């Protein structure tokens, strides 16, 4: 269940409330079940997956990818598996914990773990959205945002791409009003 936190401390957990608060950004948020396949769930329990295991998992949820290809023109996908044992993880994550934008939409399907996206709304107020397993988010191109993990530093996410050129972060000078949880 997604959790949206406003700067004044207000917290929303109902999808209709979260959607209302994010409507000015045109962010899409959906609940996408992973399914009941035991092997799929076993793969999600592992920190490190081989390329073959990643592909096996991706194929188990490809019905979502097929829908995105048809409706939004996505061309490829991969499975990102972040865990604390990744060398230089903090340096890698530091590329995304500052306000930035991307030239393309950022589409993520969180399948394990927890992550936080923060957003700057058109009125310059800020919100933070905690995403949990089985939640899909699409952040439109040029939306000012940041990203970080919980202290556990574990997340698995399917990333959907319409191209790879638009994934370079373009940093802004906006100061983040929230403190990392």
Swiss-Prot record:
Source organism, top-level taxon: Bacteria
EC class name: oxidoreductase
Presence of keyword Secreted: no
Listed EC numbers: 1.13.11.54, 1.13.11.53
Pathway linked to the protein: Amino-acid biosynthesis; L-methionine biosynthesis via salvage pathway; L-methionine from S-methyl-5-thio-alpha-D-ribose 1-phosphate: step 5/6
Residues involved in Fe(2+) binding: 100, 102, 106, 145
Alphabetic keyword roster: Amino-acid biosynthesis, Dioxygenase, Iron, Metal-binding, Methionine biosynthesis, Nickel, Oxidoreductase
Residues the record marks as site: May play a role in transmitting local conformational changes: 105
Cofactor note: Binds 1 Fe(2+) cation per monomer.
Cofactor(s) demanded: Fe(2+); Ni(2+)
Pfam families registered for this protein in UniProt: ARD (PF03079)
Biological process terms in GO annotation: L-methionine salvage from methylthioadenosine; L-methionine salvage from S-adenosylmethionine
One Gene Ontology molecular-function label: nickel cation binding
Function according to Swiss-Prot or TrEMBL: Catalyzes 2 different reactions between oxygen and the acireductone 1,2-dihydroxy-3-keto-5-methylthiopentene (DHK-MTPene) depending upon the metal bound in the active site. Fe-containing acireductone dioxygenase (Fe-ARD) produces formate and 2-keto-4-methylthiobutyrate (KMTB), the alpha-ketoacid precursor of methionine in the methionine recycle pathway. Ni-containing acireductone dioxygenase (Ni-ARD) produces methylthiopropionate, carbon monoxide and formate, and does not lie on the methionine recycle pathway.
HAMAP family named in the record: Salvage_MtnD (MF_01682)
Family recorded in the similarity comment: Belongs to the acireductone dioxygenase (ARD) family.
Subunit composition and interactions: Monomer.
PANTHER family the record matches: ACIREDUCTONE DIOXYGENASE (PTHR23418:SF0)
Listed name of the protein: Acireductone dioxygenase
Organism: Trichodesmium erythraeum (strain IMS101)
Gene of this entry: mtnD
């Amino acid at each position: 269940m997604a959790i949206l936190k406003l700067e004044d401390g207000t917290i929303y957990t109902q999808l209709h409330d979260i959607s209302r608060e994010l409507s000015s950004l045109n962010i899409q948020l959906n609940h996408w079940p992973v399914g009941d396949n035991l092997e799929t769930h076993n793969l999600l329990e592992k920190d490190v997956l081989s390329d073959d295991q990643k592909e096996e998992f991706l194929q188990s949820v490809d019905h979502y990818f097929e829908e995105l290809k048809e409706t939004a023109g996505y061309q490829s996908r991969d499975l990102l598996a972040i865990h604390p044992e990744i060398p230089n993880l903090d340096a890698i994550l530091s590329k995304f914990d500052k306000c930035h934008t991307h030239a393309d939409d950022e589409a993520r399907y969180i399948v394990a773990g927890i992550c936080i996206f923060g957003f700057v709304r058109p009125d310059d107020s800020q919100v933070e959205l905690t995403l949990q397993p089985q939640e899909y988010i699409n952040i439109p191109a040029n939306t000012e945002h940041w990203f970080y993990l919980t202290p556990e530093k574990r997340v698995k996410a399917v990333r959907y791409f319409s191209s790879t050129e638009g994934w370079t972060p373009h940093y802004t000078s906006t100061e983040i009003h929230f403190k990392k949880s």
